[in-house]
């Protein structure tokens, strides 16, 4: 027996975290496909998984192939592609089963039963006899005969049963199956054998009334905001595209809507065309492409392929390529019209000896950022700064309204800024116009142009008003940074001196 050493030296273990998980610049595809459960934001980590779920002949798979390829010579590839149900019409509630046992095993069910609820009313299934079934469709028909008010089908891709209510709207529903009778020959119960229980991995898809594009996007971000770009699997109408653009604009530099169309108005322009309306409303957060969806998804893929931890990892979208992606613009007049309308495209250019298929030119449809790389860089930097400040506030005992506290804030912001200097989001040495210098002087109350030119960034943290301090509001914090953009065109005279 001895006196514990902790009476003299007591060490409390602690950890200073390296930080939180960063925002993933993943993409979301809105789909009307009936096999997509609502309101699940379903993520896939590869094109094969998309093909296995939606089918290899589906548009979802076709677009996923493009998304996961990234751009040629990218140092990383996209990690995740999400899908979300676009319910432009009222949809039915459904139970989407997990993979069920095969027909031979299910034939051993002769007096099966379980309880399931349809549209709020419980249905008790008894005497379910599958012994005569020859196919999965036979089994689906036998289940449907017992579960009144539903349609039951078997999905050959997912190898599961789907029980769908015959009603639609907010009150339409099908619950998980419970209380399955045990089948000794299978070593499990009926509901589990059919893949209809929560424990087995079944998914409940809620019924809903028809939703507007705005309601759809708000439902999606309730599931997760760990994504940035989005577009539609189907061709959105001009009205729907404009509403999606308005939603992106209303969310303050958080999302990028990748609109697309092959409509003649993309080339001709005009007040009623999609580019005309996008320009008129000056929406922030939308890029428009001339294509059938594939180039739009390529835009999303480029964002998801950026390696923010790599030296000069930030990219320009112009001149990016992907093997197998078909050009959507092949003549000079069309490309000139598209560029005038701020419509992007995948173009075929040619010199006398070579042809080049490239994306061009990365312009945003409206707003103040000009090009998509500027916008995406801001989304990334905004998020890492927010995360750095939150991590810092969690790890410090308190943050006083004095120089010591303000120095801590500057330190928290310095780590993201150093990363931005490394990956190319921030470029020192950018020459400012006199108008820009004047605006900076007005905002900062001093001439910061030399510091900004030299360092690429300026941080200022100052005291707030006493009444702000009394309510524990924010200090006055401003961060300015410069970005050198990217050259989209080279022109010069070639002079022979003879």
Where are these regions (language model features)?
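Structured, hydrophobic secondary-structure cores that serve as assembly/anchoring elements
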Residues: 1-60, 69-79, 360-498
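Polar low-complexity, Ser/Thr/Gly/Ala/Asp/Asn-rich disordered segments used for subunit assembly
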Residues: 1-25, 32-36, 41-122, 126-295, ...
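Extended basic-aromatic, gly/pro-enriched interface segments that bind polyanionic ligands
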Residues: 3-11, 156, 277-414, 419
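General structural signal for secondary-structure boundaries
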Residues: 46, 111, 211-213, 236-237, ...
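Helix N-terminus capping/helix-initiation residues
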Residues: 58, 195, 212, 329-332, ...
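Short beta-strand elements
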Residues: 114, 351, 479-483
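Short, surface-exposed charged micro-motifs
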Residues: 151-153, 346, 478
């Amino acid at each position: 027996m001895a006196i514990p050493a902790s009476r003299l030296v007591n060490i409390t273990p602690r950890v200073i975290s390296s930080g939180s998980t960063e925002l993933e610049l993943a993409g979301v595809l809105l789909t009307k496909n009936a096999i997509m459960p609502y309101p699940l934001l379903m993520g896939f980590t590869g094109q094969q998984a998309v093909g296995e779920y939606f089918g290899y002949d589906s548009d979802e798979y076709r677009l996923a192939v493009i998304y996961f390829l990234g751009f040629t010579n990218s140092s990383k590839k996209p990690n995740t592609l999400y899908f979300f149900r676009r319910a432009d019409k009222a949809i039915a509630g459904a139970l989407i089963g997990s993979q069920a046992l095969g027909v031979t095993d299910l034939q051993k069910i002769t007096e099966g039963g379980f309880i399931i609820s349809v549209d709020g009313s419980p249905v008790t299934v008894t005497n379910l006899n599958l012994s005569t079934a020859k196919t999965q469709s036979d089994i689906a028909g036998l289940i449907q005969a017992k579960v009144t008010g539903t349609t039951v089908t078997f999905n050959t891709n997912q190898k599961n049963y789907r029980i769908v209510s015959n009603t639609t709207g907010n009150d339409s529903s099908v619950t998980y199956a419970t209380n399955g009778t045990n089948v000794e020959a299978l070593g499990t119960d009926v509901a589990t054998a059919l893949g209809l229980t929560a424990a087995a991995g079944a998914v409940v898809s809620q019924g809903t009334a028809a939703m507007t594009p705005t309601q759809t996007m708000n439902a999606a971000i309730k599931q997760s905001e760990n994504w940035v770009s989005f577009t539609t699997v189907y061709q959105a109408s001009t009205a729907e595209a404009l509403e999606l653009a308005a939603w992106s604009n209303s969310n303050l530099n958080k999302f990028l809507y990748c609109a697309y169309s092959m409509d003649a108005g993309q080339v001709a322009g005009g007040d009623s065309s999609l580019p005309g309306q996008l320009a008129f409303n000056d929406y922030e957060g939308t890029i428009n492409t001339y294509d059938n969806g594939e180039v739009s998804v390529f835009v999303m893929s480029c964002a998801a392929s950026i390696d923010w931890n790599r030296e000069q990892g930030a990219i320009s979208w112009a001149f990016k390529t992907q093997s197998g992606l078909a050009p959507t613009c092949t003549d000079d007049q069309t490309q000139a019209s598209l560029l005038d309308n701020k419509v992007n495209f995948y173009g075929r250019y040619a010199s006398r000896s070579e042809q080049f298929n490239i994306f061009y030119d990365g312009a945003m449809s409206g707003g103040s950022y000009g090009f998509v790389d500027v916008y995406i860089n801001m989304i990334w930097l905004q998020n890492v700064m927010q995360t750095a400040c939150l991590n810092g506030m969690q790890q410090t005992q308190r943050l006083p309204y004095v120089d010591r506290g303000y120095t801590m804030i500057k330190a928290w912001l310095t780590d993201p800024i150093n990363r931005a200097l490394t990956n190319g989001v921030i470029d020192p040495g950018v020459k400012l116009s006199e108008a820009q210098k004047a605006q900076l002087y007005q905002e900062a109350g001093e001439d910061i142009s030399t510091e900004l030119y030299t360092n690429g960034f300026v941080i200022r943290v100052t005291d707030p008003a006493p009444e702000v301090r009394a309510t524990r509001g924010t200090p006055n914090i401003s961060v300015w940074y410069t970005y050198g953009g990217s050259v989209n065109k080279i022109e010069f005279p070639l002079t022979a001196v003879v």
